[in-house]
């Protein structure tokens, strides 16, 4: 029985970046042998075991043979005769198909180290086409390593394109699409996930709602980049510089989703795209089974972002209503996320003007939250009268703040 460190841990060691988790492959062993050594089996479709002390994953070396379309259509062989090279051959990219033995010697049958040096994301073999999830994984690794200068090898991109044309992506299950997309939202360059899928025509199949934004014009006076798809990616990029939270990044990306559905004859104007966008976001989240917290933040940003930008043009009553609608008084941290997504939208336009709205909205909120029910309860207010009195008091508060702003500008 021989044990090898494999996959991402080897790759990251060679890149000199922190190793998040270690996975191991066991060659020349049986499930019974590992169970005798107190390993605990957790794999359902093939034997994966947890080390009795470290709790790290140990998998028996295996081969995979395509037996049916889609992600689950494989027959696995994990007999004692399977070699390490055979196990590494089933992996997606050469940089993920390296191993180290217990003495630290590198086993690299598919030139992964060379591709690390050349900063290439290259498939291991033609078996790449057997698993449609690999298209998503390559796009995710592009988002992870873009800042290091990595790019997808031309031959791998062509293979991804052929998989799209052959309809392989139709077998992707919604949960796996979201799993890879969500992971990409946590990377340094989440926009590269979208760009990589678009470069092989996979975006049209996997995320048609986002793909349809490309080619939709924006008013030049507000958007120097003009194209809505490009603007959405610029907003995603800007949001990743402002926040590490994938919820915020997702909301930033889809905030203008409704622009592809506005009447073409009205372009480049997009009246009503906010509400149209909320419908598309809800449908997208339902289709891919995206968690409710992602959906709710994205819907709120899509609906409110224009009014957030136009703060100084709004009436005090409208401002208080907006704060009530987004639940800012009870959930100020949620409102903070909304403001970050809106700031990303504004800053993505390439303007050098500082986005003052974040500071101004926070100033209003910090004063308005000082208005509490107790003030009106002791005055004899009851029921809905308390809510209305609080609303009017907050409106008066906003009026005072805005008057102060105007006097300071003189």
From Swiss-Prot:
GO terms for molecular function: ATP binding; CCA tRNA nucleotidyltransferase activity; cyclic-nucleotide phosphodiesterase activity; magnesium ion binding; phosphatase activity; tRNA binding. It comes from the Bacteria. The keyword Calcium does not apply. Magnesium is required for nucleotidyltransferase activity. Nickel for phosphatase activity. PROSITE patterns: HD. InterPro entries: CCA_bact, HD/PDEase_dom, HD_domain, NT_sf, PolA_pol_head_dom, PolyA_RNA-bd, tRNA_CCA-adding_enzyme. Its EC number is 2.7.7.72, 3.1.3.-, 3.1.4.-. CDD domains: HDc, NT_ClassII-CCAase. HAMAP family: CCA_bact_type1 (MF_01261), CCA_bact_type2 (MF_01262). Catalyzes the addition and repair of the essential 3'-terminal CCA sequence in tRNAs without using a nucleic acid template. Adds these three nucleotides in the order of C, C, and A to the tRNA nucleotide-73, using CTP and ATP as substrates and producing inorganic pyrophosphate. tRNA 3'-terminal CCA addition is required both for tRNA processing and repair. Also involved in tRNA surveillance by mediating tandem CCA addition to generate a CCACCA at the 3' terminus of unstable tRNAs. While stable tRNAs receive only 3'-terminal CCA, unstable tRNAs are marked with CCACCA and rapidly degraded. This is Multifunctional CCA protein. It comes from Legionella pneumophila subsp. pneumophila (strain Philadelphia 1 / ATCC 33152 / DSM 7513).
């Amino acid at each position: 029985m021989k044990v090898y460190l494999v996959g991402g841990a080897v790759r990251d060691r060679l890149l000199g970046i922190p190793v998040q988790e270690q996975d191991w492959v066991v060659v020349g062993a049986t499930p019974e042998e590992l169970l005798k050594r107190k390993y605990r089996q957790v794999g359902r479709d093939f034997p994966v075991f947890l080390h009795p002390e470290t709790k790290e994953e140990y998998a028996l070396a295996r081969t995979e043979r395509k037996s049916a379309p889609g992600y689950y259509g494989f027959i696995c062989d994990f007999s004692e005769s399977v070699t390490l090279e055979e196990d590494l051959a089933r992996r997606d990219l050469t940089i993920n198909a390296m191993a180290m033995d217990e003495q630290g010697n590198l086993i690299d049958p598919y030139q992964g180290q060379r591709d690390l040096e050349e900063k290439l994301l290259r498939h291991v073999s033609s078996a790449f086409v057997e698993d449609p999830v690999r298209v998503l994984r390559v796009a995710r690794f592009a988002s992870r390593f873009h800042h290091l200068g990595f790019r997808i090898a031309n031959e791998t991109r062509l293979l991804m394109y052929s998989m799209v044309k052959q309809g392989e992506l139709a077998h992707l299950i919604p949960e796996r699409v979201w799993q890879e997309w969500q992971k990409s939202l946590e990377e340094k360059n989440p926009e590269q996930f979208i760009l990589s899928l678009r470069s092989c025509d996979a975006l049209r199949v996997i995320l048609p709602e986002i793909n349809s934004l490309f080619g939709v014009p924006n008013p030049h006076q507000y958007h120097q980049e003009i194209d809505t798809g490009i603007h959405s990616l610029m907003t995603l990029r800007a949001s990743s510089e402002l926040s590490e939270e994938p919820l915020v990044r997702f909301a930033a990306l889809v905030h203008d989703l409704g622009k592809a559905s506005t009447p073409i004859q009205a372009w480049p104007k997009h009246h009503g795209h906010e509400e149209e966008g909320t419908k598309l976001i809800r449908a997208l989240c339902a289709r891919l089974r995206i968690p409710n917290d992602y959906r709710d933040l994205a819907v709120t940003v899509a609906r409110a972002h224009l009014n957030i930008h136009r703060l100084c043009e709004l009436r005090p009553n409208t401002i208080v209503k907006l704060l009530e609608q987004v639940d800012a008084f009870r959930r100020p941290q949620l409102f903070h996320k909304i403001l970050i997504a809106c700031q990303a939208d504004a800053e993505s336009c390439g303007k050098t003007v500082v986005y003052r709205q974040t500071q101004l909205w926070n100033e209003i909120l910090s004063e308005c939250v000082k208005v509490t029910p107790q003030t009106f309860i002791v005055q004899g207010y009851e029921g809905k009268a308390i809510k209305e009195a609080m609303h009017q008091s907050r409106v008066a508060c906003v009026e005072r703040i805005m008057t102060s702003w105007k006097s300071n500008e003189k």
